[in-house]
């Protein structure tokens, strides 16, 4: 089975999980995640960081209000520069899907955590945009209702299979409160991806663009 097919299957298997067991993440899993994060940071210019065995970020009223429990590991999405939220979404989701392949569960988190400065290395000019809770879930999560292909995409004439498959994969991507405020438009041999305004919609756009690439079997040069 090729790597793209494995990732496509991973997309279908992954669901958001908010309650975790106290099982520590295995050392070899931590190493694999750190290796991927190092490569992503070198490619993207971001400063993503894996934090393990640190429960303070989710020990707050808002975290409990968001029904998070047992979270002591997370991916911190940190960086600077243009289109920061979108880039964090695009590259952060790559770590999320690797974590799923390695047996972990996850949940993208916007504002229900507190920044633990001592656990993070935030340099001058950098911003913490969000975190992703990681760990061994008490459950595997559940699927949620998604929009139809026609609600989030458009093209002139018959829709090519590759474009349809890209949109289908994007519809399985996590978005803030399942809002799916994105749209794909086929323009010849290019695709325009846009997001209407909503909380975290730019980060969502990065996530769904990566999903589209996986489903369609294309690279980032597809974008108009």
What positions do the PLM features span?
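Acidic, surface-exposed loops and disordered segments
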Residues: 1-224
């Amino acid at each position: 089975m090729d790597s793209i097919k494995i990732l496509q299957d991973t997309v279908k298997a992954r669901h958001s999980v908010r309650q975790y067991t106290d099982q520590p993440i295995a050392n070899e899993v931590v190493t694999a995640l750190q290796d991927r994060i190092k490569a992503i940071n070198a490619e993207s210019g971001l400063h993503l960081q894996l934090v393990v065995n640190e429960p303070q970020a989710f020990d707050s009223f808002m975290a409990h209000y968001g029904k998070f429990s047992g979270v002591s590991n997370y991916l911190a999405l940190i960086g600077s520069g243009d289109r920061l939220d979108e880039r964090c979404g695009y590259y952060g989701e790559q770590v999320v899907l690797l974590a799923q392949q390695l047996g972990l569960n996850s949940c993208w988190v916007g504002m229900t955590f507190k920044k633990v400065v001592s656990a993070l290395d935030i340099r001058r000019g950098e911003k913490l945009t969000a975190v992703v809770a990681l760990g061994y879930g008490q459950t595997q999560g559940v699927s949620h209702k998604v929009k139809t292909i026609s609600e989030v995409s458009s093209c002139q004439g018959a829709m090519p299979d590759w474009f349809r498959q890209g949109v289908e994969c994007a519809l399985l991507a996590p978005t803030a409160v399942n809002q799916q405020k994105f749209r794909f438009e086929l323009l010849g041999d290019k695709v325009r991806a846009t997001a209407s305004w909503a909380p975290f919609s730019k980060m969502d756009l990065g996530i769904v663009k990566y999903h589209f690439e996986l489903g369609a079997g294309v690279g980032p040069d597809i974008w108009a």
